[in-house]
From Swiss-Prot:
It comes from Ectopseudomonas oleovorans. It is an enzyme of class 5 (isomerase). Its EC number is 5.4.4.1. Catalyzes the rearrangement of hydroxylaminobenzene to 2-aminophenol. Involved in the degradation of nitrobenzene. This is Hydroxylaminobenzene mutase HabA. It catalyses: N-phenylhydroxylamine = 2-aminophenol. Keywords: Cell membrane, Isomerase, Membrane, Transmembrane, Transmembrane helix.
Length: 135
């Protein structure tokens, strides 16, 4: 899983770089910058998790769960913010970044789902990693 975390982190970092190029064509450029930064910060988070992986003392099932929580949380974070930028959505969860931008109810629900659903994943994964390191 260490190699997959490295690869996933590098892909997300690359997506963050590409996302930066899309800022000028986003409906909401401020949210576009936020999407760019999500890729640029969440990619290295996955790489750091990969560096910690050999030191984890966790059962296989917990390692697998942690891996998928990290992947889902980081990619949902990037995707949710990026879709909000492209669609002009995200007013409910990021009112300052969204500004006056609003999108269709379906697009707003998609962004809201992604951004709400990543919260448990992004809290659980580092807690499990910490437990695995301290064992």
């Amino acid at each position: 899983m260490q190699t997959y975390l490295f690869a996933s982190g590098l892909v997300l970092f690359l997506l963050g770089l590409v996302t930066g190029l899309l800022v000028p064509v986003s409906k909401n450029p401020r949210m576009g910058v936020a999407g760019h930064l999500q890729g640029m910060t969440n990619g290295p988070l996955l790489i750091i998790a990969g560096l910690l992986w050999p030191y984890l003392e966790l059962p296989d099932a917990w390692q697998l769960a942690t891996f998928w929580l990290l992947i889902y949380g980081t990619y949902a974070n990037w995707l949710g913010v990026q879709l909000a930028a492209l669609w002009g959505a995200g007013a409910k969860l990021a009112p300052i970044a969204a500004g006056e931008h609003r999108s269709t109810p379906l697009k707003e629900r998609v962004v809201t789902f992604l951004l709400f659903s990543l919260i448990p994943a992004m809290f659980a994964a580092p807690i499990i990693l910490l437990i695995g390191i301290l064992r």
